[in-house]
């Protein structure tokens, strides 16, 4: 924790692990990972780094390479490789957790790298899973590993590297040990497994850290006082923040949320600052059971870090301080609580974060000056020298002028901001008025176009009606002409049939006359031959008689019915 407002501590205890940020690449949170592995069982999301967020840079490329392994081509290649591995040589995560180290290591040496990567990915999916099945599987694996007595630094030396990474990931619940871009040495992995090295990859200190042999560092397996909370046993990478509280006396760190929740932040007097009142907010360290005042620590954090905070970070830090001093009974703590609440409201209303940071720093200066005044008045109220009084008055005047300048600058900035907003509104109104006039003109234009289209539609409708009337008349004329044509065709067919029959009848009469004359001639010649020579052939005479009778009968037959010839006008006579 930071120094008090009146102390001159040799180094400023800013939030934890500031000295480690420059050395490691993993600066963002691997989640808050618990080190209390014995009585309490947590889900992978609580005890493991299943919510880890990797930093930018090479580690992001590592994550991309991991995602590329899940593509179809890579998966198909992995499946093909796994098909070539016999069932006797295959190793599962449960085998690694249950079976002897040397037996599993011997089998894993015969396995291809693709199969080992698939094995690590399977465990990662279990650690990442939030479903009950994944949680139960992780709890089972962790229980099996932690219940084994043969896993020591001696036996783990013979382990395969992937086997050791899987065992460490199961034991700690941190999937970062399975990441391809994080490669720790085998001795480091063994020390992490047996709780002799901090499992925080960005810390990696030997345990106990700083040769601390307090109850917490001694009795909690894997606890590191440089990066882990004394209450929840988890670590993260938050620095330059009020999220962590450090003890002035033993330098152990605690989450502010955990301290508030467990009642470690309370009212009392500090063991280090005898000038603190009985109602001042103090922090009671769980490691050394001693108290440290928090007002000076908050002041130190804001003096060193507030200028670098953005808007969201500043609001979060003010909220932390407000929650810390909510129950304060002394005047300074109550003023700080009210000031934080006021600044949070102003920032939400549009106050710039730089101005808010200046105001809170000025507030701390006021509190310090008020404390100095109270201390001077408490020493008997001795009279000040004229020069000191003048200097003090000058300081007060300068401080007042500085405050007035800041307020004036803020008001001027707000005035300029309001004026710019007003000008923007005026421009927007002008633009909207132009848009309205354009819309009206466009609407009038559209209305004229609609009227023109309606007129054209009416004209086209009238033309269509006219053409329809003409079409009806043309159709009636066509029907009349068709009836005339049909009547003329019927009449011409009748005339043709009558003429044809008359022609055929005349031809038949001529032929009959011809035949009759021929028969008559033959009969005359026959009669002449009979008179001259005697009788003729009786059969021939009979034939001529029949022919004559037929011709006479044909001459007496009735006329042909014209209706029959109409139905078949081109029929030949028999």
From Swiss-Prot:
One Gene Ontology MF term: identical protein binding
Tissue distribution: Expressed in roots, seedlings, stems, leaves, flowers and siliques, especially in the vasculature.
Keyword Transcription regulation: yes
Domain of life of the organism encoding this protein: Eukaryota
Record's keyword terms, sorted: Coiled coil, Developmental protein, Host-virus interaction, Metal-binding, Nucleus, Transcription, Transcription regulation, Zinc, Zinc-finger
Region (Disordered): 1-76
Biased composition (Polar residues): 1-10, 65-76
Recorded coiled-coil stretches: 416-524
SMART domains given in the database record: PHD (SM00249)
Major location category of this protein: nucleus
Deletion phenotype: No visible phenotype. When associated with OBE1 disruption, plants exhibit premature termination of the shoot meristem and impaired root apical meristem establishment, leading to a diminutive phenotype characterized by an absence of roots and defective development of the vasculature.
InterPro entries: OBE1-like_PHD, OBERON, Oberon-like_PHD, Oberon_cc, Znf_PHD
Any one Gene Ontology BP term: maintenance of shoot apical meristem identity
Gene Ontology cellular component list: nucleus
ZnF segments: PHD-type: 226-291
Localization annotation: Nucleus
Protein induction: By auxin in the root elongation zone.
Biological role: Probable transcription factor that acts together with OBE1 for the maintenance and/or establishment of both the shoot and root meristems, probably by controlling the expression of the meristem genes such as WUS, PLT1 and PLT2 and of genes required for auxin responses. Promotes cell meristematic activity via the WUSCHEL-CLAVATA pathway. Involved in the development of the basal pole and in auxin-mediated root and vascular development in the embryo. Confers sensitivity to turnip mosaic virus (TuMV) probably by promoting viral movement and multiplication via interaction with TuMV VPg.
Subunit structure, interactors included: Self-interacts. Interacts with OBE1, OBE3 and OBE4. Binds to VPg of pea seed borne mosaic virus (PSbMV), turnip mosaic virus (TuMV) and lettuce mosaic virus (LMV), but not with VPg of tobacco etch virus (TEV), cowpea mosaic virus (CPMV), tomato black ring virus (TBRV) and grapevine fan leaf virus (GFLV).
Name used for this protein in its record: Protein OBERON 2
Organism: Arabidopsis thaliana
Gene: OBE2
């Amino acid at each position: 924790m930071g120094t008090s407002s009146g102390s001159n501590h040799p180094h400023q205890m800013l939030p934890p692990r500031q000295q480690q940020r420059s050395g490691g690449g993993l600066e963002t949170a691997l989640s808050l990972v618990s080190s209390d592995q014995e009585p309490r069982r947590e889900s992978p999301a609580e005890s493991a780094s299943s919510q880890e967020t990797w930093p930018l840079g090479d580690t992001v490329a590592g994550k991309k390479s991991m995602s590329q392994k899940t593509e179809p081509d890579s998966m198909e290649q992995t499946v093909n490789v796994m098909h070539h591995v016999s069932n006797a040589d295959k190793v599962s995560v449960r085998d690694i957790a249950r079976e002897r180290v040397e037996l599993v290591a011997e089998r894993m040496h015969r396995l291809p790298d693709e199969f080992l990567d698939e094995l690590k990915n399977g465990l990662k999916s279990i650690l990442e899973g939030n479903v009950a099945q994944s949680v139960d599987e992780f709890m089972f694996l962790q229980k099996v590993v932690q219940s084994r007595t043969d896993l020591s630094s001696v036996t783990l030396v013979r382990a395969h590297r992937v086997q050791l990474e899987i065992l460490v990931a199961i034991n700690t619940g941190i999937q970062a040990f399975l990441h391809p871009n994080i490669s720790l040495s085998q001795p480091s992995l063994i020390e992490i497994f047996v709780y002799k090295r901090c499992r925080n990859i960005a810390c990696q200190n030997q345990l106990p850290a700083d040769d601390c042999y307090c109850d917490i560092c001694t009795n909690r397996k894997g606890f590191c006082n440089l990066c882990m909370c004394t209450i929840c046993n988890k670590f993260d990478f938050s620095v330059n923040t009020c999220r962590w509280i450090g003890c002035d006396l033993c330098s152990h760190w605690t989450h502010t949320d955990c301290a508030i929740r467990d009642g470690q932040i309370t009212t009392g007097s500090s063991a280090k600052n005898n000038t603190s009142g009985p109602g001042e907010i103090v922090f009671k360290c769980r490691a050394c059971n001693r108290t440290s005042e928090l007002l000076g620590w908050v002041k130190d954090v804001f003096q060193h870090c507030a200028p670098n905070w953005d808007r969201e970070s500043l609001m979060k830090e003010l909220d932390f301080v407000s929650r810390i001093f909510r129950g304060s009974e002394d005047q300074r703590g109550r003023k700080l609580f009210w000031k934080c609440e006021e600044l949070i409201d102003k920032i939400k209303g549009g106050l710039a974060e730089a101005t808010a940071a200046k105001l809170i720093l000025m507030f701390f200066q006021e509190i310090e000056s008020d404390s100095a005044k109270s201390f001077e008045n408490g020493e008997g109220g001795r009279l000040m020298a004229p020069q000191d009084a003048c200097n003090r008055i000058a300081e007060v005047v300068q401080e007042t002028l500085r405050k007035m300048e800041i307020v004036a600058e803020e008001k001027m900035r707000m005035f300029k901001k309001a004026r710019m907003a007003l000008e923007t509104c005026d421009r927007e109104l002008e633009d909207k008025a132009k848009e309205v006039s354009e819309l009206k003109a466009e609407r009038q234009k559209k209305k004229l176009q609609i009227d023109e289209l309606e007129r054209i539609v009416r004209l086209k409708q009238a033309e269509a009606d006219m053409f329809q009337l003409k079409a009806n008349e043309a159709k009636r004329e066509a029907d009349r002409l068709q009836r005339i044509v049909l009547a003329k065709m019927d009449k011409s067919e009748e005339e043709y049939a009558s003429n044809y029959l008359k022609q055929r009848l005349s031809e038949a009469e001529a032929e009959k006359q011809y035949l009759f004359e021929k028969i008559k001639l033959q009969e005359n010649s026959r009669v002449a031959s009979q008179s001259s020579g005697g009788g003729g052939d009786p059969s021939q005479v009979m034939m001529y008689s029949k022919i004559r009778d037929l011709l006479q009968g044909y001459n007496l037959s009735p006329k042909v019915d014209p209706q029959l010839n109409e139905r078949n006008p081109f029929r030949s006579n028999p």
